Amino acid sequence: MGKVYVFDHPLIQHKLTYIRNENTGTKDFRELVDEVATLMAFEITRDLPLEEVDINTPVQAAKSKVISGKKLGVVPILRAGLGMVDGILKLIPAAKVGHVGLYRDPETLKPVEYYVKLPSDVEEREFIVVDPMLATGGSAVEAIHSLKKRGAKNIRFMCLVAAPEGVEELQKHHSDVDIYIAALDEKLNEKGYIVPGLGDAGDRMFGTK
């Protein structure tokens, strides 16, 4: 079973408070999401393998460490996930970026894939799928399914705010995927919004309604 990590770092929690605040404007919301994504990326990459290399400092020859062998990919779920990409790339600029677009079928209410673009070497990469919110879990489940059916084998999921229902749904369908969360909230309301949550992340990020 994949693990669930909830980050309690003071900087993440401080910035998340302003992200949640309904009075935070589009510009600040966007910048704060970017900053929290960077802080979370620092934690999510903590277990990357290292190898020892020989270098020359200005003083003498030395042995030092570099990340070993891992090819990384970041996959935002369109559209709100786009706001987390640059924050991650600040720490791992060599990562390739894919995209998964989903819409909700008006009759079944289930997510339907309409766009997928991934790096050509899918099987060789470790992917971080990102979306600000994990509410019902439907979009995350379908996005990860899209990656797996194209050959991805090593996937992590990262979000700012999650509902217990979404975590349970994602674990039910993708038990091999670790989940990284800035805050695990109380529940979903009758409209499917996370409570207390942060509203509609896409609308707040892009200034739409």
Swiss-Prot record:
Activity regulation (record text): Allosterically activated by GTP.
GO biological process entries: UMP salvage; uracil salvage
Single GO MF descriptor: GTP binding
The record's free-text note on cofactor binding: Binds 1 Mg(2+) ion per subunit. The magnesium is bound as Mg-PRPP.
Binding of uracil, residues: 194, 199-201
Keyword terms, alphabetized: Allosteric enzyme, Glycosyltransferase, GTP-binding, Magnesium, Nucleotide-binding, Transferase
A Pfam family this chain is assigned to: UPRTase
Metabolic or biological pathway, per its Swiss-Prot or TrEMBL entry: Pyrimidine metabolism; UMP biosynthesis via salvage pathway; UMP from uracil: step 1/1
Domain of life, source organism: Bacteria
Cofactor: Mg(2+)
Keyword Chaperone: no
Gene Ontology annotations for the cellular component aspect, listed alphabetically: cytoplasm
Keyword Thylakoid: no
Residues binding 5-phospho-alpha-D-ribose 1-diphosphate: 79, 104, 131-139, 200
EC number assigned by the record: 2.4.2.9
Catalytic activity entry: UMP + diphosphate = 5-phospho-alpha-D-ribose 1-diphosphate + uracil
Sequence similarity: Belongs to the UPRTase family.
Free-text function comment from the UniProt entry: Catalyzes the conversion of uracil and 5-phospho-alpha-D-ribose 1-diphosphate (PRPP) to UMP and diphosphate.
HAMAP family: Upp_B
Name of the protein in its database record: Uracil phosphoribosyltransferase
Origin species: Bacillus subtilis (strain 168)
Gene that produces this protein: upp
